């Protein structure tokens, strides 16, 4: 297993993995988003196993309020994914540790994340990795003007 910070030629590999986690997005869309990171404000890590892209993690600094925290900035795990064929080998934990180390290097005292309420696997991963549940919410939106 090799964990590296994705850049240059490895960013498209990470974007392809991210699209497996977030199927509503296209790789080019994610690459464009990642390229807008303010230097030092976000990072993408790539896990390689036997020369094959196996997983990725995206983390960022959040300076706004983060549920359950009392410091700023907070390192935030925006997404983490390991392909099914590579699960159970410690890749997700290694990716998380890379993100946590990145956040520590930027002065963060706390690290946070979120997941869908019905994602039992993600909840178990987070709890097993030392996260404590901070809150459960349901989010709502309402259109204020008619769409054209």
What are these regions (language model features)?
Residues 93, 105, 117-136:
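Conserved active-site alpha-helix within GNAT-family acetyltransferase domains
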Residues 15-29:
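Helix-loop element at the rim of GNAT/NAT acetyltransferase active sites that forms part
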Residues 96, 103-114:
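Conserved GNAT acetyl-CoA-binding A-motif
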Residues 82, 88-101, 124, 128:
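Conserved acetyl-CoA-binding loop-helix of GNAT-fold acetyltransferases
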Residues 70-84, 138:
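Conserved acetyl-CoA binding element of GNAT-fold acetyltransferases
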Residues 1-14:
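A short beta-loop-alpha structural element at the N-terminal edge
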Residues 35-46, 76:
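A short helix-loop-beta-strand connector motif used in the catalytic cores of GNAT acetyltransferases and
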Residues 46, 52-61, 76, 81:
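Conserved beta-strand in the GNAT
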């Amino acid at each position: 297993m090799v964990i590296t910070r994705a850049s240059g030629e490895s960013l498209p590999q990470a974007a392809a993995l991210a699209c497996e986690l977030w199927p509503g997005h296209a790789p080019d869309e994610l690459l464009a988003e990642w390229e807008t990171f303010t230097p030092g404000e976000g990072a993408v890590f790539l896990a390689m196993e036997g020369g094959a892209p196996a997983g990725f993690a995206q983390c960022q600094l959040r300076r706004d309020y983060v549920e359950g925290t009392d410091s700023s900035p907070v390192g935030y795990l925006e997404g983490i994914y390991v392909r099914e064929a590579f699960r159970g080998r410690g890749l997700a934990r290694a990716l998380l540790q890379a993100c946590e180390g990145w956040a520590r290097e930027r002065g963060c005292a706390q690290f946070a994340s979120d997941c869908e309420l019905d994602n039992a696997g993600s909840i178990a991963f987070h709890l097993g990795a030392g996260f404590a549940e901070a809150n459960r919410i349901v989010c709502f939106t309402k259109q204020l003007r008619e769409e054209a």
